[in-house]
Amino acid sequence: MPLPDKFFLFIQDDYHNVKLRVKINEKVLRGQPLIFSDDFNVPVHAPTSGLIENICFNSDSIKKNIKIVISPDYLDQWIRLNPIKDYKKYAPEKLIKIIHQSGVVGLGGGQFPSSKKIIFSINRAHTLIVNAVESEPYITSDNCLIYNHISEILIGCKIICWITKIKTVLIAIQEDNIQSISKIQHLIKNKSLFKICIIKKKYPAGSSKVLVKSLTGKEVPHGKHSIDIGYLIFNVATIFSIKRAIINGKPLTERVVTLMSDKNLLSGNFWVRIGTPIKYFLTSNKLKQSFIASVYLGGPFMGKKINNLNHSILKKTNSIFITHKKEKNESISEKTCIRCGYCSYVCPVNLLPQQLYWYIKNKNHVQTKKHYVLDCIECKACEKVCPSYIPLVKYFIQEKNILKNITLENNRKKMSLIRFKTREQRLFNEKRMIHENNDTFLMKKKDKKINNITKTVLKKTLQDAIERMKSKQ
């Protein structure tokens, strides 16, 4: 796909600790880091060579974000790359650092730093699960990647196993991807390390907790992650990016994105640069804005609607779903819950959506937490079967944010209390030291006075004795 006239790179800055490495009117090369990396932030890299046109703080497109605008020079020049031929000659710590500095994050939607995930799995995980199961219907980006780049993905798996000392790799793939399955079987040579696991096509089979249950029969406990029970899960796109970061020395600047519509007028996979405006992406594929009703980042179930087409492709954007304009408005208003219980039957993580809905309506945050609203994977299966058209996931997301804010506020109060107690203890210790020093000073002064009196008495006694001796003579 040709380069757009502008790239929009959004950098999340929830903690206000992002430090920029570039400034306006500065020339950059493709792969050049735009921010300094730390424990909380992986770097974002320039998707092409060009000029930093503008830097906007707290932009309107996404709240709490920094927006960097790059005008390409169409030369597409890379920075100096440092490929590694034999990764086994390097220490695991060095490889993890390269993955971190290459900006690799979870490309299945989580966007959690892959370097941290690998660090957490060392001495804890015994199995690597390669997630090639599409999270939603119609999305084919993972299948496209695994079909065309399976050899590179297998190398990426070996790199992760070298770092974490994992001895088993399970490649999870859907049963309808027959060509990809046969290609994997043909290329796998180490049968003791790699095992292919064919998953039935059932939504949402690609969710990490559902996938672990399907493959192993084990359930991830509430409030825990798959690593806690010994399974490290990576999306195929993430593993592919890890391979490119180590072997090719290339940071993450592009990804495969599925473009699809509700009427199946268009469906395809494209290599898209991070930061490409969605409006340009659609127009370059001959989609007229006048025929588009809405655009979703993601699939038809879990996709999030966007109103501003100047929004850009993010690292976690695996697909764009388009709905076309219809002659009639088919929007249906929310009705009262009839307690049918259908939502509970279809929930893949065994929650009680109906009960959570009533607790949320009554603002009973204690009960929503006890009933594991934080474990909701936001698959919207409950919404699809609800006869009252209640947007349950919308309520669950709002409740998650409320619980998150409550937790942050409680932690802030705890830290304030700890700081207050520490300060009080310090002041008490200082006062005690002052009193002890004063008492010591007074004791020394008193002892000195007593010594002076004693010396005077002894001197007088001695003089009296001398005078008595003289009088006797």
UniProtKB/Swiss-Prot annotation:
Its cofactor is [4Fe-4S] cluster. It comes from the Bacteria. It is a peripheral membrane protein. InterPro entries: 4Fe4S_Fe-S-bd, 4Fe4S_Fe_S_CS, Ion_transpt_RnfC/RsxC, Nuo51_FMN-bd, Nuo51_FMN-bd_sf. GO terms for biological process: electron transport chain. Its EC number is 7.-.-.-. One of its GO terms (molecular function) is metal ion binding. [4Fe-4S] cluster 1 binds at residues 337, 340, 343, 386. Residues 328-357, 368-396 form the 4Fe-4S ferredoxin-type domain. The complex is composed of six subunits: RnfA, RnfB, RnfC, RnfD, RnfE and RnfG. NCBIfam families: PRK05035.1, rnfC. Part of a membrane-bound complex that couples electron transfer with translocation of ions across the membrane. This is Ion-translocating oxidoreductase complex subunit C. It comes from Buchnera aphidicola subsp. Acyrthosiphon pisum (strain APS) (Acyrthosiphon pisum symbiotic bacterium).
